[in-house]
């Protein structure tokens, strides 16, 4: 802890640079998420339209606007690079860590604990996986974290003026959250604070001052809400009923999963700090009266977790907002353990990292080398990747072992367990995964044919977004499948963006009279190119991605 106290800021900055900045540009974009958000912002900048999101020139109503604004600004500053695509998420994660540090300082007035909380947060597997990935979840997590910090300020406020200011800030944070991901940003803070206001008997205060937060949120979001309602009257109907009600509650909700789905996600997500999880949560409950700030954090963790577990639609990214309060609970528990020399949990944490690292290293070595016949992850030419992956996870285990030694004296170095893996992960991905989920590699290998084509079509929205991003054109056509663009394609002015499988042959005859045609299809595992497709002048196949190139006819 002395090391954190003496040079915590420098160590934290170094860790952030190594994990969140250094390796980011070299990693290819993943489809469908990263290619989608990259292309939406590229098109917004190209069109100069910061009100209505479009993807491939088609209306895209799945999310509000603020997250795209983050990404727009990133691309405007850093250009069309993978780093720019991910910088919005990285910046949001950094600000979330700042809020974690600030709240820890407000709670405990201890710089070492504050730095530790921020370090735990930034080093959590779920946080750095999503926080360096181009999705909107780091941004909504930022605003939910900010809203809970603002709510804590309302609890500390002593005068009516201070309470009004704190509730106004709370409303502004919720308003930004709403403009990032919708009504979720309003529901999560409300359910998080209910147990707190009940325990502290502040229900009356919430009723009196709560409307100030509502007014603040409305004032912030109303200009864009009215602007898009004027431009696209159907936006709010689609966004509310389809994106919220169906996704979370109805029988046909997207990404359905059992109620216990988040338990293993939570355990994996807090690595390399899993050994602190049970006792930190238990401490928050046992000391809820003596240390009400721990109950504040516990409610912030559990209420959203219960809410997302009950909802039918589930994704691992949904519980990212739970990581900030968890890091604070863990920091408080670890600090108490270290101060009282109760090192058992810290040793257990090291043992978990040791076991996890070496089990993963062994599994990758055995499977990667083809020693388990029916499990094929890497090709015969990818043994170097297998060795690097084995070394990366072995490094995780070695650091875990080091944190156990000398009575867990260096327990806080658990943050370094995933460091080697993070730095190398871009070079460890099997080629079959790259060719399926990272279309930039495929596009670059077939760039001449694709860039010279008058028409480019594909049967995957994620691949289409990748094509549009790499080729800097938004007129990529959808072939056979509509995917998440189904709603936007229903508009009369977007009908020509889609070609059905039945109409493709006739369409191709006319299209080839105007120029070359490229069709990119994504195959299932071991699937062959369908015989029903017209014979191409050139075929390029890379695992599950295939390019059928048709030359212009005289």
From Swiss-Prot:
It is found in: Cell inner membrane. The keyword Cell membrane applies. It is an enzyme of class 2 (transferase). Its EC number is 2.4.2.43. The lineage of its organism: Bacteria, Pseudomonadati, Pseudomonadota, Gammaproteobacteria, Enterobacterales. This is Undecaprenyl phosphate-alpha-4-amino-4-deoxy-L-arabinose arabinosyl transferase. NCBIfam families: PRK13279.1 (NF009784). It comes from the Bacteria. InterPro entries: ArnT_tfrase (IPR022839), Glyco_trans_39/83 (IPR003342), LipidA_mod_glycosyltrf_83 (IPR050297). GO terms for biological process: lipid A biosynthetic process; lipopolysaccharide biosynthetic process; protein O-linked glycosylation; response to iron(III) ion. One of its GO terms (molecular function) is 4-amino-4-deoxy-L-arabinose transferase activity. It is a multi-pass membrane protein. Belongs to the glycosyltransferase 83 family. The keyword Nucleotidyltransferase does not apply. It comes from Yersinia enterocolitica serotype O:8 / biotype 1B (strain NCTC 13174 / 8081).
